[in-house]
Amino acid sequence: MASTTEDLAVWAKALYEGRAFPAKLMPQALTGVSAPMLGKEARYGLGVIIRPTPLGTAYGHSGFFPGYLTEMVYFPDHKIALALQVNSSVPRSIGRPPVGFLVELAQIILEGDRR
């Protein structure tokens, strides 16, 4: 399967807003267990990384394929989804976890909306 960052962001929004599957399944997917290997205070639900951010709770998933890193994240308090793909399969090759870039980008977008 080939996908673009735009496809992933659209998918994340549909998925985490309950439009991809019956909405009654979402509480099961979003009830996570502690997953410290994914970040401080992170939890892992059914295929969902649940983590606190400065923008509130974020839902998402990351992945890699040799030569690529991918991250998608959805901020339910703001109803925005973002995705990032990087040409590297070394997790720290970009200096920090990819989700950090997405949180920062979301903050910039939201600040622009307030102006």
Describe every region a protein language model picked out:
Residues 1-115:
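Catalytic loop of the DD-peptidase/beta-lactamase superfamily, centered on the K-T-G motif
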